Every structure is written in C-alpha cells, then in structure tokens.
Regions:
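Rossmann-like AdoMet
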Residues: 1-58
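Conserved alpha-helix/loop element of class I SAM-dependent methyltransferases that forms part
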Residues: 60-73, 197-201
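Conserved class I S-adenosyl-L-methionine
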Residues: 73-83
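Conserved SAM-dependent methyltransferase scaffold
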Residues: 86-90
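Conserved SAM-binding motif I beta-strand of class I
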Residues: 100-117
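S-adenosyl-L-methionine
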Residues: 119-165
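Short SAM/SAH-binding signature in class I
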Residues: 158-173, 179
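C-terminal substrate-binding/active-site "lid" region of AdoMet-derived donor-dependent transferases
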Residues: 175-277
C-alpha cells in the first residue's frame, strides 16, 4: 500500500476543516490553538494509571479520519475508544448518507458508527458532545476487557463486541490499564507494557474484502496483528502520522460484496488488488 492509495491529494487541513464545518463539532476555541499533533515530553504521561484526564483532540488525525471515511464512502464503522473521533466519524458517515446516487446494497447497519469503550464516564462525556443530527448514527457499547490468549500469545479481548460487518475499523482503545486478570502472571497493567487488543484477529475470517483497519499509534499492537493476520492484507505505516493501515485486498466474495466495493471504492480497488497478485 502507498500513501497515495489513502490520500490521493495533499490535504490542506485548515481548508478542509472549514469546508466540512468541523470547527462546530470540535469547538472553535480548541481549533484556534493548533491543528498539528502535540506531544508531551514526560515519558510516563500516557502510561500513568492515575491520569484520568481525557487526551486533547489531535486535529490532523481527526481531519484525516473524516477524509478517509468520505473518500471510501464508508457505510459502517467500528471504533475502539470513544472521544472526539466518534463525533468526527459520525459526521463523515452522515455526509455519506446524503449521497443521492447510493445503489441498493446489502448492508444491515447502513450508515452506522459503533463505538466500544471500557469507560462509562468517557461514553457519557462523548454522548453530551454529540449534535442531535448525529445521534442516530452513533451506537455506544460499553465492554470490559480481559487478559486472554490468541494462538498461545498473551493479549487482550473485549468481553463483548457489536455484531456488525464494518467497512472500517479504527483502533484507539482500550488503554493498557483497563484489562482485568492475568495470564500466568502477565498483564498489560504495567507502565512498561503496551495495549495488545486481539479482537480483530478473532473476527478476521468474517471481514469482507475492502475492509480498512487503522491503528492510531499502538505500534506494538499493530505489529502483533500484522504478524497474525492470515488473509491478503496490504499494510502501510506512515511515520509522519504514527498510524498503521491495513486493507483487505481479495476478490469479492460474491455479487453483493462486489456491488458494495464498486460503489464505495471503485475501479482503483481492483488496481490495488492486481498489484498484490
């Protein structure tokens, strides 16, 4: 996968923000600070179990997410970890739903975002930020996370996942201190550990060709998933964004999957597929 497969043209972040009216979703006061990613020089800032303060929005990440959802005409999105991303994803899905040229495709969760989180508090905070016009798009799911194994490798699994077939999976949760239990004394609840969610691996065989997975950071987790995926995935890591992308490139499963690929991704999907054959 090349970066141009995801972003055919360079994004003017501030122009995109204004043209898509995202400032009203995120908050003009927040946006006026900076669009670029901010970093904290304290190496323990993001791995402090006592730090309950939600991370501030990273506008460049949010704008790229919005762009990808619209560009790929995504209809069903699965998100791990709620926040500002939930609102931005829902807005992009809502705008996709306004397309008057949508063909009749087989999709039981058409134009829905399903967001999973381990914190009822963060779910409630996000709910309060959602504009009324997007409330029917977002479906929140609370679930605990448990230390587990995948093919004998220690990892974490959510106790419950929404029963959907997503076009895009965005992974930005859970944090490493949420999982309960341990496997032979090992858990992620240590500042030197890292998140290691494996739910995608357990559901891989259900995912349809054309599915895109995005890991926001979480490099160790993304590498674990990459080394255990079994189907024909195209992979890209973009250091500038610190994001990992996986696209499932396979021939369509049948006429219904093909019809959806043709509408959402177009002929360029088959060009990418042919590169892997």
């Amino acid at each position: 996968m090349n970066i141009s497969d995801l972003f055919p043209e360079k994004i003017d972040y501030r122009k995109y923000l204004i043209n898509n009216k995202l400032e009203s979703l995120i908050g003009k006061n927040e946006i006026s600070k900076t669009i670029k990613k901010t970093t904290n020089k304290n190496p323990f800032h993001n791995v402090n179990p006592k730090n309950n303060e939600p991370l501030p929005p990273e506008f460049d990440d949010l704008i790229r997410l919005h762009f990808i959802i619209k560009k790929r005409k995504a209809t069903t999105v699965l998100e791990y970890g709620v926040g500002y991303s939930s609102i931005v994803l829902a807005d992009a899905i809502f705008k996709n739903s306004q397309d008057n040229s949508i063909p009749k495709i087989r999709c039981s969760n058409l134009f829905e975002l399903h967001s999973v989180d381990t914190s009822k508090e963060y779910i409630n905070i996000t709910k309060k930020r959602i504009p009324k016009r997007l409330s029917s798009i977002i479906n929140f799911h609370f679930s605990n996370v448990t230390m587990s194994e995948f093919n004998g490798r220690i990892c974490t699994l959510f106790d419950s996942n929404p029963n959907i077939s997503p076009d895009i999976i965005y992974v930005d949760g859970p944090d490493q201190f949420s999982p309960t239990g341990d496997i032979r004394g090992i858990s992620t609840r240590h500042s030197d550990r890292m998140p290691m969610v494996a739910d995608i691996l357990s559901m891989e065989h259900f995912l349809c060709p054309g599915t895109l997975i995005i890991f926001d950071g979480r490099t160790a987790n993304a590498r674990f998933v990459k080394s255990n995926l079994q189907r024909n995935w195209s992979y890209l890591y973009v250091e500038e964004f610190d994001q990992h992308f996986f696209e499932l490139l396979e021939t369509p499963l049948g006429e219904h999957n093909k019809k959806k690929i043709d509408y959402c991704l177009g002929e360029y999907y088959y060009e990418r597929l042919n590169r892997t054959i």
